[in-house]
């Protein structure tokens, strides 16, 4: 499924500011991991370190949050998982790739759509300068906004 992508700042500046504040602490955790471990490591090492930071800061989370998918009224037998489900409201998908591309974005967007989780963070630890993208899904319209 393709998404209409919009800028949340243009659509709803107040919501955009709220979400940025809400994600600020999580971004700080990711930046700490990147700063201390550096670039070019395995994705799982970054996930392990991020989980340590979440635990140290008492940030509620689930690592490898599994979810089911319904298809034609039946539950598909195999489950997917997102790297982190934080505060029961935010999906974090961790990457360690040269650069974020459409495949990584589409993966996160599909997870958000299938579960109705409205906030998603795509974080790439591999480059020398880390990359972070934030998304908000309007579940009524299926419009994906970046912020």
Where are these regions (language model features)?
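A short acidic/basic microdomain associated with nuclease active sites
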Residues: 45, 55-73
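Conserved catalytic cores of phosphodiester-cleaving nucleases, focusing on short active-site segments
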Residues: 38, 82-98, 111
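Nucleic-acid nuclease catalytic cores
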Residues: 95-147
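Nuclease catalytic cores
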Residues: 19-24, 39-43, 47, 51
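Interdomain/boundary linker segments immediately adjacent to catalytic/signaling cores
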Residues: 1-37
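A short, glycine/Asx- and small/polar-enriched loop/turn
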Residues: 75-80
